[in-house]
């Protein structure tokens, strides 16, 4: 019988514990972790993500600000706004919601964020810390997946881990985090040949490609742990993952659902990293 990895329940448990830590920090040091999320344009999916982040931040006792900008805002104006929050001592985490309009360069915006406040973990300084084995701010989705492995007692050392998708947001940082735990990692992508054969060798299969139900049972060996990062809509508007959940569940030993799997953990790690940034600020 397959075991469901319940990211929603784990996220609720972690956020409740985080709220207590925030309360203690406020009582002992007079510090409230501050998070600002900047949303450019009216992308419907981005608006949902931002609302969820704001709701979770407020529930955990954070100072939460959301700045909504027109998609006509110029890059210089956005960088100027980021610089204001870089200098604001009440803000410990800055997140610019991606994707951005085409006329704004993502890399320039990420570079503009103070690495100490880069709670998304995308700044080159933070990725450098990750690649050198000294992670500080880590992209939130891979960080959340690592927490799931820990909470569910999933052994990583010596295991074959296959990641489908090589993005800077999930695939690449996920690979490094697994390497740090002594897993043997294969990072695959759209040009990978004989993908199904490679995936069938995985003890741990992590899928983040943005194609609904792409991974079927032909890609999965019996007893594998399957982590589905995908968030897609089917023809009826229903939220589905990159993994064909029903048929893959027949083979997997453990699997994350969509929704209710990885997504809630991503938001939880965003809050955790903002809290840790506030702690570091106190110790300076």
From Swiss-Prot:
GO terms for biological process: L-histidine biosynthetic process; methionine biosynthetic process; purine nucleotide biosynthetic process; tetrahydrofolate interconversion. Pathway: One-carbon metabolism; tetrahydrofolate interconversion. NADP(+) binds at residues 165-167, 190. One of its GO terms (molecular function) is methenyltetrahydrofolate cyclohydrolase activity. Catalyzes the oxidation of 5,10-methylenetetrahydrofolate to 5,10-methenyltetrahydrofolate and then the hydrolysis of 5,10-methenyltetrahydrofolate to 10-formyltetrahydrofolate. SUPFAM superfamilies: Aminoacid dehydrogenase-like, N-terminal domain (SSF53223), NAD(P)-binding Rossmann-fold domains (SSF51735). Transmembrane segments: none annotated. It catalyses: (6R)-5,10-methylene-5,6,7,8-tetrahydrofolate + NADP(+) = (6R)-5,10-methenyltetrahydrofolate + NADPH; (6R)-5,10-methenyltetrahydrofolate + H2O = (6R)-10-formyltetrahydrofolate + H(+). Homodimer. It holds the Pfam family THF_DHG_CYH. HAMAP family: THF_DHG_CYH. Belongs to the tetrahydrofolate dehydrogenase/cyclohydrolase family. Its EC number is 1.5.1.5, 3.5.4.9. The keyword Membrane does not apply. GO terms for cellular component: cytosol. Keywords: Amino-acid biosynthesis, Histidine biosynthesis, Hydrolase, Methionine biosynthesis, Multifunctional enzyme, NADP, One-carbon metabolism, Oxidoreductase, Purine biosynthesis. This is Bifunctional protein FolD. NCBIfam families: PRK10792.1, PRK14179.1, PRK14186.1.
């Amino acid at each position: 019988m397959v075991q469901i990895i319940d990211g929603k329940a784990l996220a609720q448990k972690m956020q409740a514990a985080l709220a207590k830590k925030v309360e203690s920090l406020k009582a002992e040091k007079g510090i409230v972790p501050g998070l600002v999320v900047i949303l450019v344009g009216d992308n419907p999916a981005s608006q949902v993500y931002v609302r969820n982040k704001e709701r979770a931040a407020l529930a955990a006792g954070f100072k939460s600000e959301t700045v909504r900008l027109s998609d006509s805002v110029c890059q210089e104006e956005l960088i100027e706004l980021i610089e204001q929050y870089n200098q604001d001592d009440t803000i410990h985490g800055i997140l610019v919601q991606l994707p951005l309009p085409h006329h704004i360069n993502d890399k320039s915006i990420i570079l503009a964020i103070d690495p100490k406040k880069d709670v998304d973990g995308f700044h080159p300084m933070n990725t450098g810390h990750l690649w050198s084995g000294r992670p500080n701010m880590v992209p939130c989705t891979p960080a959340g997946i690592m927490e799931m492995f820990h909470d569910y007692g999933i052994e990583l050392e010596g295991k074959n881990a296959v990641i489908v998708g090589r993005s800077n947001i999930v695939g690449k940082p996920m690979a490094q985090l697994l390497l740090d735990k002594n897993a043997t990692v294969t990072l695959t992508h759209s040009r990978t040949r004989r993908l199904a054969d490679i995936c069938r060798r995985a003890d741990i299969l992590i899928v983040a490609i943005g194609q609904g139900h792409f991974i079927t049972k032909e890609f999965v060996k019996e007893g594998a742990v399957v982590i589905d990062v995908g968030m897609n809509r089917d023809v009826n508007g229903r939220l589905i993952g990159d993994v064909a959940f029903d048929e893959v569940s027949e083979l997997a030993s453990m699997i994350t659902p969509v929704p209710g799997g990885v997504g809630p953990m991503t938001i939880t790690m965003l809050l955790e990293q903002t809290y840790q940034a506030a702690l570091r600020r106190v110790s300076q």
